[in-house]
């Protein structure tokens, strides 16, 4: 038998902790969706800037961008 029940065992509810009390208000908004686009445009700008950053790093790595005064072996 995979599960076993113990007769007369008392199981208390979830324990309250300081961290749990601190994080409880953050979880109270679970499942609620704000109407409209929200912060989607901001996320799009962040993704575009990150893509530009990655392309600059790739161009430097491939030496396709000339850097004056920096010698690369």
Curated annotation (Swiss-Prot):
Free-text description of this protein's post-translational modifications in UniProt = Phosphorylation is a light-dependent reaction catalyzed by a membrane-bound kinase; phosphorylation occurs on Thr residue(s) in the N-terminus of the protein.
As for subcellular location, the record says:
Plastid, Chloroplast thylakoid membrane
Q: Identify the keywords attached in UniProt to this record, alphabetized.
A: Chloroplast, Membrane, Phosphoprotein, Photosynthesis, Photosystem II, Plastid, Thylakoid, Transmembrane, Transmembrane helix
Look up the domain of life of the source: Eukaryota
GO biological process: any one?
Answer: photosynthesis
State the family named in the UniProt similarity comment for this chain. Answer: Belongs to the PsbH family.
Summary of subunit composition and partner proteins: PSII is composed of 1 copy each of membrane proteins PsbA, PsbB, PsbC, PsbD, PsbE, PsbF, PsbH, PsbI, PsbJ, PsbK, PsbL, PsbM, PsbT, PsbX, PsbY, PsbZ, Psb30/Ycf12, at least 3 peripheral proteins of the oxygen-evolving complex and a large number of cofactors. It forms dimeric complexes.
| The protein's name | Photosystem II reaction center protein H
Upper taxonomic lineage: Eukaryota, Viridiplantae, Streptophyta, Embryophyta, Tracheophyta
């Amino acid at each position: 038998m995979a599960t076993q029940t113990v007769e007369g065992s008392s199981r208390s509810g979830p324990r309250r902790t300081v961290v749990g009390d601190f994080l409880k208000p953050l979880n109270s908004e679970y499942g609620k969706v704000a109407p409209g686009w929200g912060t989607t445009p901001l996320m799009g700008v962040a993704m575009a800037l990150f893509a530009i950053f990655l392309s600059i790093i790739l161009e430097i790595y491939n030496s396709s961008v000339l850097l004056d005064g920096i010698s690369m072996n």
